[in-house]
A protein has these predicted regions:
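Short Lys/Arg-enriched alpha/beta "domain-start" segment
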Residues: 6-24
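Cytosolic juxtamembrane amphipathic/interface segments immediately preceding
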Residues: 16, 20, 82-87
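Short, charged cytosolic
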Residues: 51-79
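Short hydrophobic alpha-helical membrane-entry/anchor segments
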Residues: 108-118, 135-144
């Protein structure tokens, strides 16, 4: 394999991965906006779990398909009209990851700083306290700049599919991207 062909293949793979990642980030923002709309409509126990994929997002909820699609379209319109705050959620799993990371790193740092004088349980407690203080604001920043992207101006909600499992539905909401960004 020639070096030029190999480098071109690496570039194409990187370009493809970048597009997939960008689509997931945009769908993550729309998923958050959908949950935000559901909560604003008083469906507090409605949106339970959501996650984004390159072609849309999945929500587990007690709301029916029409309610989810309506909330998704409303949430998308909110972001498109400039309300980027709905794309950041206090309930996002990113916040849990950030809290765990801060707790672990701060516990290690405290142990290193205090050395043999330290008590492991106190280090863990201090790590937990630091995590509690900083995880929400840092989690919001990580969502804003890493795990979501609110540049969704040309995206459309394509369709929805639902499966009922007991008292819950599993909803798949499909998004469409113009200009081959999802190919």
């Amino acid at each position: 394999m020639s070096p030029a062909l190999f480098n071109n293949t690496k570039f194409l793979m990187f370009d493809r991965i970048s597009k997939i990642t960008l689509n997931v980030r945009k769908n993550h923002a729309i998923e958050h906006a959908t949950v935000s709309v559901l909560l604003a409509e008083g469906k507090k126990k409605s949106a339970v779990l959501g996650f984004a994929i390159p072609t849309g997002f999945i929500i587990s909820s007690k709301s029916n398909k029409n309610e989810i699609l309506s909330a998704a379209r409303s949430g998308l319109k909110l972001i498109q009209s400039g309300d980027e705050e709905v794309s950041i959620s206090q309930f996002c799993g990113t916040n849990i990851v950030v809290a765990a990371f801060i707790s672990g790193v701060s516990t290690l740092l405290i142990s290193r700083i205090l050395g043999k004088k330290s008590k492991n349980i106190l280090n863990m407690a201090n790590g937990f306290i630091l995590s509690s203080l900083f995880s929400k604001p840092i989690g919001r920043l990580v969502q804003k700049y890493v795990t979501t992207n609110s540049n969704v101006k040309n995206i459309k909600i394509s369709k929805g599919r639902s499966i009922k499992l007991g008292s819950f539905y599993i909803h798949y909401v499909s998004t469409s991207y113009p200009n081959l960004s999802s190919d």
